[in-house]
A protein has these predicted regions:
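N-terminal helicase ATP-binding lobe
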Residues: 1-285, 292-296, 300-341, 348-381, ...
Length: 615
């Protein structure tokens, strides 16, 4: 429907793309009785029931899902109670799978296994144990196949089943948002694209900003009186914890993340966290990481507010691809959503490159690799061969090879895809363009708001590599910038600076000002001294102190040094006036014009006139 498919479909599908029309309210089984072999099914819409269709299909099925929550969700659904479904993931043993297979054969039931990629080997081994040939007897379906490209850089095992996959007689891949696949083994595949004949656009409000925290705070204030649950999708538990803490929502929040992140948050004292989704865990604010972006069904009665967050500087991996990520996230809610927002900042240092330019970079990297191999093969001595071999091991191109030194095409696709996504976050115009290029998916409301305190400055303050002086200097610049803001906003920013940075600088800026701190060269020792002196002067020249001093001492009267010292000490202690230096008889010169005089053997002062007017 007016969308350019070359960005999204496997580029090696050169011969046939079949389109099937679907009406509003229809599911996949109503327009496609079963998924054909050697097919990449482009669902276009999430929630069409591709997994449901395969679990109900009259054949043995093994479905590879991207992660465990998807499988757990299907196992719990009442609609699959009679489907003989077995979920396989970490903790499910090979023997347990074999027992299931034997029982299924005994009862003449179809095999219906859902497994993570990492656990597929256990399924394969268990099938061999009981004499089942997966490649000839089962339909192998790779669900949410875009994850093969998206995740392979940090999760290499996700592509482990692919060699086996291509050797199966009956096989297919499915996703609403497939991504380019350069693997030549797709040459004999067809693409079937589901084409809705109705408007399926979702409205999304993009909130571009230079301060993600403040934008989140402002957005939350827009629906603070709304009882609708809010679902945040943020692929960084550090960012989640920081946002919960700084927005004051931590006591009304639940977090859903990996087991490792669960422990991390519990170590920070936050316990309302789980690696499994459950309606019983829902809070006013619900925070989910990327393991809940795809395939997973969130079935709740309300139409929630959905907020996606991208923080380019501290969590580059939180950059969302409008096509693959945003579409998938908004498709998690089976009863629909109320409203959707994408809060994001931008990094102008990210390189903007076209796909062709990225491919040239890849090809150059490959050329360097191939050249060194050629030189190594032609080297005449062992020492030369070793030198070339050691150099080869350091080349960037190795990231595109599997453990047998073969090209991992999914790693190549991942590199291209990641570099393209980075370009979206160079500036607001790039992201807006990316959203528009998704075609029929979104109606965009675009807002861009800048704040005096930028995320880039917060990075400087939080960085362990930034010098303390540079951090303090940055804080002073921020404090100077926010000094003209509305009182409540300025107070919020100051609290954040105390949280992220140095409380002394915030305190001293209020009392000493920018120029004085710069004059003191941002030195904590000198700043503390200046604060003490200023406070001493303020306290010691306050009305109460002056009244006591001028009541004790009179003009045109001589006082001995010991008397002056004792009386001033008594007054300072009575009023709890701080003082950095010892109080002596000379301190009286802060309050009186006086002449140094001796009487007999004692030195003292003749007080001429007061320096302050107390009325």
């Amino acid at each position: 429907m007016g969308r350019n498919l070359t960005r999204f479909l496997p580029i090696n599908i050169r011969f046939m793309t079949k389109e099937i029309i679907i009406h509003e309210g229809q599911y996949l089984r109503e327009v496609l009785s079963s998924i054909p072999t050697n097919t990449i099914l482009v669902k276009t819409l999430t929630g069409l029931g591709a997994t449901y269709s395969e679990l109900k299909a009259d054949r043995n099925s093994i479905i590879i899902e991207p992660n465990k929550p998807v499988i757990l969700g299907k196992e719990k659904q009442e609609r699959h109670k009679l489907d003989n479904l077995l979920g396989v993931y970490e903790g499910v043993s090979r023997d347990a799978i074999a027992d299931y297979l034997n029982e299924s054969m005994r009862k003449r039931k179809h095999i219906k296994i859902m497994t993570t990629p990492e656990s597929f080997r256990k399924v394969q081994d268990a099938c061999e144990d009981v004499g089942i040939n997966i490649q000839n007897e089962c339909f192998l379906l790779f669900d949410e196949c875009h994850k093969l490209v998206k995740d392979v850089d940090f999760r290499t095992d996700i592509a482990l089943p692919m060699d086996f996959f291509f050797n199966c007689v009956d096989k297919a891949m499915v996703s609403a948002t497939p991504i380019n696949c350069q693997d030549p083994r797709f040459d004999n595949f067809q693409a079937i694209r589901i084409v809705p004949d109705f408007d399926y656009k979702k409205r999304i409000s993009i909130r571009a900003t230079n301060n993600v925290l403040q934008m989140t705070r402002e957005l939350l204030s827009e629906f603070k009186d709304d009882d609708t649950p809010v679902f945040f999708f943020v692929n960084s538990t550090d960012t989640i914890y920081s946002l919960m803490k700084q927005t004051g929502t931590i006591n009304e929040s639940s977090v859903f993340c990996s087991a490792k992140s669960v422990e991390k948050l519990k170590d920070l004292g936050f316990n309302n966290v789980s690696e499994e989704w459950g309606k019983d865990y829902i809070s006013k604010y619900n925070w989910l990481t990327s393991r809940f972006y795809n395939a997973f069904d969130i079935e709740i009665d309300q139409k929630p507010i959905v907020v996606m967050v991208t923080e380019c500087y501290v969590a580059e991996w939180s950059m969302l691809d409008p096509y693959a990520d945003t579409v998938q996230i908004l498709g998690r809610f089976r009863n629909g959503i109320g409203s959707a927002y994408h809060i994001c900042n931008f990094n102008p240092n990210l390189e903007v490159r076209t796909k062709d330019e990225i491919l040239i970079s890849y090809k150059c990297s490959k050329s360097v690799y191939d050249t060194l191999w050629t030189l190594m093969d032609s080297a005449s001595t062992k020492e030369m061969k070793d030198a070339f071999y050691n150099a080869i091991q350091t080349l960037p191109y190795n990231r595109f090879l599997d453990d047998r030194n073969r090209v991992n095409y999914f790693a190549v696709d991942n590199y291209i895809d990641e570099e393209l996504v980075k370009t979206y976050y160079h500036d607001p115009d790039c992201l807006e363009k990316a959203y528009k290029e998704t075609g029929e998916y979104f109606t965009i409301d675009y807002q861009n708001k800048a704040f005096p305190w930028k995320d880039t400055e917060r990075i400087i303050i939080e960085s362990k590599t930034t010098s303390l002086k540079e951090k303090r200097k940055t804080m002073v610049e921020i404090l100077d910038a926010i000094s003209e803001l509305d009182g409540s906003i300025a107070i919020q920013h100051k609290r954040e600076l105390e949280w992220f940075g140095d409380k002394l600088i915030v305190e001293s800026f209020e009392e000493l000002g920018k120029d004085k701190i710069e004059e003191l060269d941002y030195s904590p020792r000198r700043i503390k001294e200046a604060l003490v002196l200023k406070r001493q002067k303020e306290h010691s020249t306050g009305t109460e102190a002056l009244e006591l001093i001028y009541n004790k001492f009179r003009s045109n009267v001589w006082y001995g040094a010991s008397f002056i010292k004792n009386q001033l000490n008594e007054i300072f202690e009575k009023l709890n006036i701080p003082h950095q230096k010892a109080i002596t008889s000379h301190t009286i010169l802060d309050y009186f014009n006086a002449v140094d005089q001796r009487k007999k053997s004692e030195r003292g002062y003749l007080l001429i006139s007061p320096k302050f007017d107390v009325g």
